[in-house]
Amino acid sequence: MGKGNNMIPNQHYHKWWQRHVKTWFNQPARKVRRHANRVKKAKAVFPRPASGALRPVVRCPTIRYHTKLRAGRGFTLEELKGAGIGANFAKTIGIAVDRRRKNKSLESRQRNIQRLKEYRSKLILFPINEKKIRAGESSLEECKLATQLKGPVLPIKNEQPAVVEFREVTKDEKKFKAFATLRKARTDARLVGIRAKRAKEAAESEDAAKGDPKKAKK
């Protein structure tokens, strides 16, 4: 049967149709090969995390999925600046950077800044020169305790929906006209300059009338 609202398949096989049958006999071997490649990569990047670089927390696009959180491509320059990490330095310590992404809300920026700070606090940074340990690098005792992280780096947990409290609608809320209020607010914003100009002209005309009593009589 077809999937979704698609056409029901009704193929009429002919013209040596056995040639066009797609087989899937290599699935078990692919699984073994992927596992071997993961092990090979983990050994190559040791003691770095086997799953790769740290990714930001972003929301899925479209109104259908925007309540879900997932891993993004890389951190923005604003997020790195808020955490006090340079973009070039971030790449060397396992943090993904995306120069194209822009922060569109304060909440997402603060969430990722906090994520970077948490990662930085847990990170064991091996010194370039063991004899001269620079600021920010871990000591030799801490480096001996380092182990490779096998799972995802700082796994993302979806937020729990807020608890909604039900109550009766008040009389004032029933009388409130949302559309009229929004329309009045838009009108006031559009006419603020014109009304200020009219008020200024009216004040100037009153001052002129007070200064010349003959003009006021006329």
Swiss-Prot record:
Keyword vocabulary terms for this entry: Cytoplasm, Ribonucleoprotein, Ribosomal protein
Disulphide-bridged cysteine pairs: none
Recorded family membership: Belongs to the eukaryotic ribosomal protein eL13 family.
A GO MF term: RNA binding
Pfam families per UniProt: Ribosomal_L13e
Name this polypeptide is given: Large ribosomal subunit protein eL13
Subcellular location: Cytoplasm
Gene3D superfamilies: 1.20.5.110
Organism lineage: Eukaryota, Metazoa, Ecdysozoa, Arthropoda, Hexapoda
Assembly: Component of the 60S large ribosomal subunit (LSU).
Organism encoding this protein: Drosophila melanogaster
GO cellular component, one term: cytosolic ribosome
GO biological process entries: cytoplasmic translation
Primary location group: cytoplasm
Function: Component of the ribosome, a large ribonucleoprotein complex responsible for the synthesis of proteins in the cell. The small ribosomal subunit (SSU) binds messenger RNAs (mRNAs) and translates the encoded message by selecting cognate aminoacyl-transfer RNA (tRNA) molecules. The large subunit (LSU) contains the ribosomal catalytic site termed the peptidyl transferase center (PTC), which catalyzes the formation of peptide bonds, thereby polymerizing the amino acids delivered by tRNAs into a polypeptide chain.
Bias type Basic and acidic residues, positions: 199-218
